[in-house]
């Protein structure tokens, strides 16, 4: 049986305050498939030696080949917004996770994209990330 491919989105250049938390989310997601973007959870220097075009083309190819996209959208990021727009255009199954207790407001372009078919946004507290992911994969994601 083929393993499911999961594309995880999280802020890189928009701010790395949540990088360690992204690593926890990624670790939890591994039970559901292969994570194509595990580097998003690394706390070291961002993708040394890769130019912007290479990063864009590689990440877009991964996004398009993925079965599911999970995005942590609390830290605003132009790149994550772009990835989500491309995911919607490609009719991908998407879960966005947002922490309202961060003091931020989620963009209307993200929350307004909820369609109850393949684009979902879950508000959560940081200690609830695993249960929100588990619920999504149990209810929304079909077996690979």
Swiss-Prot record:
Signal sequence residues: none
Its cellular-component GO annotations read:
cytoplasm; nucleus
Pfam families per the UniProt record, alphabetical: Nuc_deoxyrib_tr
The molecular function GO annotations come to: 5-hydroxymethyl-dUMP N-hydrolase activity
Q: What InterPro entries does this protein's entry cite?
A: 2'-dNMP_N-hydrolase, DNPH1, Nucleoside_deoxyribTrfase
Q: Which family does it belong to?
A: Belongs to the 2'-deoxynucleoside 5'-phosphate N-hydrolase 1 family.
**Quaternary structure (record):** Monomer and homodimer.
User: Under which name does UniProt file this protein?
Assistant: Putative 2'-deoxynucleoside 5'-phosphate N-hydrolase 1
């Amino acid at each position: 049986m083929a393993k499911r491919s999961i594309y995880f989105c999280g802020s890189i250049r928009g701010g790395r305050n949540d990088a360690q938390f992204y690593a926890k989310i990624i670790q939890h997601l591994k039970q559901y498939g292969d994570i194509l973007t595990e580097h998003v959870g690394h706390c070291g220097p961002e993708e040394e030696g890769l130019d912007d075009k290479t990063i864009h083309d590689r990440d877009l190819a991964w996004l398009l080949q993925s079965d599911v996209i999970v995005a942590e959208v609390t830290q605003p990021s132009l790149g994550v917004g772009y990835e989500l727009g491309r995911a919607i255009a490609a009719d991908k199954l998407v879960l966005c996770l947002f922490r309202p207790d961060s003091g931020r407001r989620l963009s209307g372009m993200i929350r307004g994209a909820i369609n109850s078919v393949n684009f979902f946004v879950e508000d959560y507290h940081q200690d609830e990330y695993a249960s929100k992911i588990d619920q999504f994969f149990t209810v929304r994601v079909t077996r690979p």
